């Protein structure tokens, strides 16, 4: 068995050390280091970090983007812009691609259209949704549509204890809402305040939803690999009257990915379930800026940083964004490897040779690197297990019948 790296006591001890910090108010976590949080527009409360570090009488400003959101995302304000820094660490989750532009009106019209079709069939609407942000975004949009009488008085059940708790957190911070959400809150008396909205608490309440028709069930997890959503899919996925709506990214190897890509049968809790429900997808909710969104955020920078470190993405995504920044923005952009270190005071790269004095013609000078040690950690047992499960799923999909699937799995078991 795998031993946990921490337990509940460790978690409680860590939580007891947390303290909240207001945005835009600098604080000093250590001597000669000042930190300021700015709105990142990714999820409620998300921030990018401005760090001013002073050493030997010299100060360097480092900005760490973390996850950056898109402009015009539901509820929360657009990401702040920052004009100047010495060094930038920027994410690249979608650094190599752009999504189709989906406006607010297009998104709302699609919801109304899908709801209308589902209600005609007389079944349930099942929506796998992340507990954080996605559930609240959907409730916000559904509230707008109900206010405009674009969708009926169909009951909406949020069947996720975590989503319920997070929704309460949203209600505490109206100062984070954008202008549209603020207006909705004023007009409706609350951002999620409608008699058709219901939050389940107990497992028994969740089970009772199986007995109801003409309802909407929002439940986690968003990729259908855990949580109450698996029970709702098991009981409803087979029925042609029902509709399943995907509103978020479905990672390779997940149950949500299989269903959204058109699988005719899936296994849930060891039972083979036919996919008879109508499968729909609604776009426009991503909390991640795509390539154009990242470039738009970077456009606010008035003078190119001394160096931009492109991180937090698949290698091809990071390389694509770095290449664009070098080619079109004349940024010095690099994709650092895990274990590399950089001296920001003299701006030299840390590697395996002695430190040399930097001159204007030398980009990086190697001093020390722990990259080889880190390389062996990049793919740990959890990564390898995930890869194995993906390969097994692919193997099963290519089998023509149950007999072949059993034979292939038995061969794998024999190898073990």
What residues fall within each predicted segment?
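Active-site metal-binding loops of divalent metal-dependent hydrolases
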Residues: 43, 66-68, 92-93, 130-132, ...
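Short, compositionally biased "basic patch" segments
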Residues: 74-93, 174-180, 250-276
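Charged, amphipathic alpha-helical linkers/stalks
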Residues: 339-404
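Generic long, charged, amphipathic alpha-helical segments
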Residues: 267-298
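Short, surface-exposed amphipathic charged segments that create phosphate/polyanion-binding patches used
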Residues: 33-37, 169-176, 295, 345-358
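His/Asp/Glu-rich metal-coordinating catalytic cores
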Residues: 1-137, 141-155, 176-179
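C-terminal, active-site-flanking charged/polar segments
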Residues: 239, 314-360
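Hard-cation-handling environments
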Residues: 112-255, 266-267, 302, 317-319, ...
């Amino acid at each position: 068995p795998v031993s946990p790296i921490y337990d509940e006591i460790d978690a409680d001890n860590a939580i007891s050390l947390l303290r909240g910090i207001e945005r835009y108010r600098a604080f000093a976590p250590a001597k000669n280091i000042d930190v300021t949080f700015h709105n990142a527009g990714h999820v409620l409360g998300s921030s990018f970090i401005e760090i001013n570090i002073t050493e030997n009488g010299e100060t360097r400003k480092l900005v760490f983007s973390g996850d950056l959101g898109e402009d015009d995302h539901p509820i929360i304000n657009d990401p702040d812009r920052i004009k100047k820094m010495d060094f930038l660490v920027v994410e690249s989750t979608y650094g190599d691609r752009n999504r189709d532009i989906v406006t607010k009106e297009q998104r709302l019209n699609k919801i109304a259209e899908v709801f209308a079709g589902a209600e005609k069939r007389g079944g349930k609407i099942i929506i796998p949704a992340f507990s954080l942000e996605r559930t609240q975004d959907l409730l916000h949009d559904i509230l707008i549509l109900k206010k405009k009488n674009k969708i009926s008085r169909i009951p909406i059940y949020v069947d996720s204890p975590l989503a319920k708790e997070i929704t309460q957190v949203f209600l505490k911070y109206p100062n984070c809402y954008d202008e549209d959400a603020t207006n909705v809150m004023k007009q409706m008396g609350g951002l999620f305040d409608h008699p058709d909205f219901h939050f389940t608490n107990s497992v028994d309440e969740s089970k009772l939803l199986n007995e109801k028709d003409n309802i909407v069930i929002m439940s986690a997890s968003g990729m259908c690999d855990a949580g109450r959503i698996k029970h709702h899919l098991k009981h409803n996925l087979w029925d042609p009257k029902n509709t399943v709506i995907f509103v978020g990214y479905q990672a390779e190897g997940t149950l949500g990915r299989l269903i959204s890509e058109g699988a005719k049968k899936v296994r849930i809790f060891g039972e083979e379930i036919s996919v008879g429900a109508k499968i729909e997808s609604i776009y426009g909710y991503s909390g991640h800026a795509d390539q154009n969104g990242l470039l738009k955020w970077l456009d606010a920078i008035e003078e190119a940083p001394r160096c931009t470190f492109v991180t937090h993405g698949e290698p091809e995504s990071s390389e694509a964004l770095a290449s664009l920044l070098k080619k079109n923005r004349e940024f010095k952009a690099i994709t650092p490897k895990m274990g590399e270190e950089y001296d920001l005071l003299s701006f030299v790269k840390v590697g395996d040779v002695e430190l040399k004095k930097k001159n204007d013609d030398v980009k990086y000078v190697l001093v020390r690197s722990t990259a080889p040690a880190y390389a062996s950690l990049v793919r740990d047992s959890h990564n390898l297990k995930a890869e194995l499960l993906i390969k097994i799923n692919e193997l099963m999909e290519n089998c023509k019948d149950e007999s072949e699937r059993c034979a292939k799995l038995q061969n794998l078991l024999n190898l073990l």
